[in-house]
């Protein structure tokens, strides 16, 4: 599965990150526009690792963002209650997935 973000998700992810414009341009190109990382390796003369790191920084930041109306919780529960909470989490994730 390719890593992709909408422009709005991308903007939220980079807010507060201390990254340069080149990193932003690379990450937007790959994550929002769907361009291959190899394109940036060639056009900018960077290593594969440098391009991958630029994309990974923004992708990791995006993973920390919660959808509006959601809250991250940590709890210690009896096994049967934990099972129920995990089902709720799976249902919520499914509802957030874009429809194909």
UniProtKB/Swiss-Prot annotation:
<keyword id="KW-0238">DNA-binding</keyword>
<dbReference type="GO" id="GO:0003677">
    <property type="term" value="F:DNA binding"/>
</dbReference>
<keyword id="KW-0678">Repressor</keyword>
<feature type="DNA-binding region" description="H-T-H motif">
    <location>
        <begin position="37"/>
        <end position="56"/>
    </location>
</feature>
<dbReference type="Pfam" id="PF16509">
    <property type="entry name" value="KORA"/>
</dbReference>
<keyword id="KW-0804">Transcription</keyword>
<dbReference type="InterPro" id="IPR053721">
    <property type="entry name" value="Fimbrial_Adhesin_Reg"/>
</dbReference>
<comment type="function">
    <text>In conjunction with KorB, inhibits the transcription of kilA, trfA and korAB operons. In conjunction with KorC is responsible for the negative control of kilC and kilE operons.</text>
</comment>
<keyword id="KW-0805">Transcription regulation</keyword>
<dbReference type="InterPro" id="IPR032428">
    <property type="entry name" value="TrfB"/>
</dbReference>
<protein>
    <recommendedName>
        <fullName>TrfB transcriptional repressor protein</fullName>
    </recommendedName>
</protein>
<keyword id="KW-0614">Plasmid</keyword>
